[in-house]
Amino acid sequence: LRLVGSEMCIRDRSDVLVLAGSIPDVMPSSMYMDIMKHLEGRGINIVVDATRNLLTNVLAYKPFLIKPNNHELGEIFGVEITDKDDVIKYAKKLQEQGARNVLVSMAGDGAVLVTEDGQEFKANAPKGKLKNSVGAGDSMVAGFVYGYIKSNDYKQAFIYGVCTGSASAFSEELATKPEVEALIDKWESASN
């Protein structure tokens, strides 16, 4: 960790660090927590997209965003989560433990965002033909981060996240910017 911490190019409060996925067995299971502890107090927005202990161990360090899916959220609390109201209930429990914002993906059932300022957003999944769900969750995180940096608005970040994740699921590979923008245009047209 000493090497990782000394090599990070994080400079200021506008930086975002995304900690995502599993870690090799040879690494300590506290790796994400150790990184967050090392960066504590620098005002960096840290996003964590991981499962089980990798996710729950970081909550004390108040990550800017965590992104479990509904099944992972249920595993954390030992329950089965089947609807968006349950997602909101348990997302708030993660906030009580330290998460600032909780974005929960629900595959074809959409997504939910519970924000640090008390807003709750629910979305159905955009319509499209599923081609490849690999990377859709990572794409959702990338879209959310991009949308938040661009707008400093949770609703816009949520829309970008949902549309980016969905566009990737509707693509053979990861979505392109035009594919994401086309879904956002559809979303905005449908809501007007």
Where are these regions (language model features)?
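Single conserved hydrophobic/aromatic residue that forms the stacking wall/gate
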Residues: 1-5, 9-12
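Conserved functional loop/turn residues at catalytic and ligand-binding sites
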Residues: 2, 62, 98
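Phosphate-coordinating loops and pocket residues in cytosolic domains that bind phosphorylated ligands
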Residues: 5, 60, 78, 159, ...
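A short small-residue
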Residues: 13-16, 143-145
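Conserved beta-alpha-beta core of the PfkB/ribokinase-like small-molecule kinase fold
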Residues: 16-85
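Conserved phosphate-binding/catalytic region of the ribokinase-like
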Residues: 37-38, 56, 84-192
